[in-house]
Amino acid sequence: MTDTHSIAQPLEAEVSPANNRQLTVSYASRYPDYSRIPAITLKGQWLEAAGFATGTAVDVKVMEGCIVLTAQPAAAEESELMQSLRKVCKLSARKQRQVQEFIGVITGKQKVA
């Protein structure tokens, strides 16, 4: 029995029926013995609309009777400047000072010797 001060919330489905898909587990043949292994194939424009564009990394969680697919966000590409900075960090201390002096000269904060 519920508490006298509680209000029952209507239960709404997390996914609308229009977004439900029905699939059947089929099989794929495995070489060299051609044994049949279970297979599920997903394809359709709805995948991209759901955030699964071609090339998207997908995290797969498997539980008894349940498979959860989660699209992984694309890693932000590092800017060309940051890539160059990483290269400079691998140089010797003398070459790093030369790069710093060069930056000082082109920004006008340091005089040419």
From Swiss-Prot:
GO biological process, one term: RNA metabolic process
Top EC class of this enzyme: hydrolase
Ranges for domain SpoVT-AbrB: 29-74
Compartments reported by the entry: Cytoplasm
Pfam family, one: SymE_toxin
UniProt GO cellular component terms: cytoplasm
InterPro entries in the cross-refs: SpoVT-AbrB_dom, Toxin_SymE-like, TypeI_TA_SymE
One GO molecular-function entry: RNA binding
Keywords: Cytoplasm, DNA-binding, Endonuclease, Hydrolase, Nuclease, RNA-binding
UniProt similarity note: Belongs to the SymE family.
The protein, known as: Endoribonuclease SymE
Gene designation per UniProt: symE
